[in-house]
């Protein structure tokens, strides 16, 4: 049937709508953040209590009996521009839901993976993959590596962005005079005080 709440009748073409499938720690936290940012989103989970909790931040919170093809289709996610599959601890369900979403024609499917093998399969199916545990471990290790590193974001395998305090030997030097680009292949994107 048609989706249960009439979710996302596409009011404005420029509005991006999100779907979150699976309300474990990652999915639940993601949904709360989407609400805080004021985004239009739908959540889908088998746990009625978790779905009920999120009805305080979105009217579009759907309980499903299973993550099968029909339940996912009937949930309303087909009206979302981006769907994030947060079933990383349920390998088979994660793969099947991701495949079903891609077959439904969802513009962008992002799936959370726990292992590199899981992620590799998701990529072959056609999903964008995120590895929250791995990424947070990398981020923490990078922060611990140098006390001057205040924050870190890995953009790609080759590109990292660091927020760092200025080392004392560089105080008073120009960007060119610091030699950061020539010695370390570092590009300074922003300076602030």
PLM segments and residue spans:
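A glycine-biased structural micro-motif
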Residues: 171-177
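A charged, well-structured terminal subsegment
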Residues: 138-156
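Hydrophobic, well-ordered beta-alpha structural blocks that scaffold small-molecule cofactor pockets
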Residues: 4-19, 23-46
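Helix N-cap at the beta1-alpha1 junction of Rossmann-like dinucleotide-binding domains, i.e.
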Residues: 48-49, 116
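Conserved small/polar residues in nucleotide/adenosyl-binding loops
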Residues: 192-193
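Internal, active-site/partner-interface "lid" segment
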Residues: 152-167
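Short alpha-helix immediately C-terminal to the canonical SAM-binding loop
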Residues: 51-52, 119
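Phosphate-bearing ligand-interacting subdomains
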Residues: 57-140, 165
């Amino acid at each position: 049937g048609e989706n249960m709440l009439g979710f996302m009748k596409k009011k404005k073409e420029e509005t991006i709508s999100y779907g979150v499938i699976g309300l474990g720690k990652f999915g639940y936290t993601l949904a709360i953040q989407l609400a805080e940012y004021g985004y239009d989103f739908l959540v889908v989970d088998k746990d009625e209590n978790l779905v009920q909790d999120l009805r305080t931040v979105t009217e579009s919170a759907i309980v499903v009996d299973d993550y099968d093809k029909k339940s996912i289709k009937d949930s309303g996610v087909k009206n979302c521009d981006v769907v994030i599959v947060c079933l990383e601890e349920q390998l088979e369900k994660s793969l099947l839901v991701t495949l079903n979403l891609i077959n439904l024609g969802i513009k962008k499917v992002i799936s959370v993976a726990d292992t590199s093998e899981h992620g590799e399969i998701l990529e072959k199916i056609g999903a964008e993959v995120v590895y929250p545990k791995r990424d947070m471990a990398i981020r923490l290790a990078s922060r611990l590596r140098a006390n001057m590193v205040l924050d870190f974001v890995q953009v790609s395998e080759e590109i990292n962005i660091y927020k760092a305090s200025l080392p004392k030997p560089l105080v008073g030097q120009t960007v060119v005079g610091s030699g950061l680009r020539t010695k370390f292949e570092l590009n300074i994107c922003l300076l602030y005080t």
